[in-house]
């Protein structure tokens, strides 16, 4: 691969990959977990710090190994079964749950905006998935063009909400001292809030794949991750502060429509609806982005003959080059998830599963430092081993507290992931 990505391009990729729908819709569940404005802001800051440390840690593996993506990082570090399980989890949980969750919140917001019965939200969500599937069948170029346009559009509502809320605050917000009002105690409130907030930071791992294409990864990769995720964290904190400066906190707790009502309060009936349309476009774009990348996971596994039916799943359309059967598989699972789950359940499950593997990747950095000290490392994690340890401790905290506080959800997430084991061994024997 040519080394052609500059610092500014890497920075733009960080920001563009991470900012999505979570910032608009997660304040309801976070505030419900923490019970206070101060702890809600603290959770966003902690999520930013953990994501930055994880990004800096995983980037060391990305720069050192001449392979493609986290599946092959795990193959190299732990053996093929771990890479397969990660790919299986991406295929059966992560990408379908992302698509289903985003389509579900689109449906929920659309019926509120249009004044339709709430019962129609799942049908609208299913319609969004099917429409995006058809757009992606036209080919990567059409889908990527739409993604570029929406990336610009999604920043406009963020900017407007922050600026107008700061200029015209309507509620006094107390950020000190930090208090947690949770029935499960301080740890439960913060951990459940973190699980929700980390959904809004999903996408940073994409940036680690840029390491071997950067002109100067040793200098620029850490800067791009630290500055990019720091800017994202600042934006998230400001947007959430803006919501709390516009609406009373008790009206935000557990409210999935916070962004809509805050927009109405700031911009009036007509202006609020226009801003909400911009937010819906942001959700739509995020959903398309995950569909665009998600349908390639079963395709990649099938190319290596690691799945039953690999011959079909590895086929691409002659006209568009799109892996049609892989796309059908991802979208079929997403439609099932829409019918069975909701936005909060789906996002919590995908974050739990993803951070299980992210933590393994952070441990792999320490493992490879011991096992292969002479491995060429164009980029090395700064402040080693402090940064990797923060990533590992943060990941373990999320995993353990999710098992304690949301046992059924964690069992479902891990259960689906572990279903990959019989598939792996069956395929190995045949």
Residue ranges with predicted function:
Residues 1, 37, 41, 114-120, ...:
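Helix-loop-helix junctions that connect adjacent transmembrane segments
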Residues 313-321, 358-407:
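C-terminal membrane-solvent junction of multi-pass transporters and transport-like membrane proteins
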Residues 71-75, 79, 111-116, 226-288, ...:
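TM-loop-TM module centered on a large, flexible mid-protein loop between adjacent transmembrane helices
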Residues 158-161, 298, 350-377, 397, ...:
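Hydrophobic alpha-helical segments of multi-pass membrane transport proteins
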Residues 1-38, 51-52, 56, 374, ...:
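Membrane-interface "cap" regions at the ends of multi-pass membrane proteins
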Residues 107, 120-171, 184, 202, ...:
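Membrane-interface loop-to-helix entry segments
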Residues 29, 52-129, 134-137, 280-300, ...:
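Hydrophobic transmembrane alpha-helices that form the core helical bundles
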Residues 72-77, 103-124, 157, 213-217, ...:
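Helix-loop-helix connectors at the membrane interface of multi-pass transporters/channels
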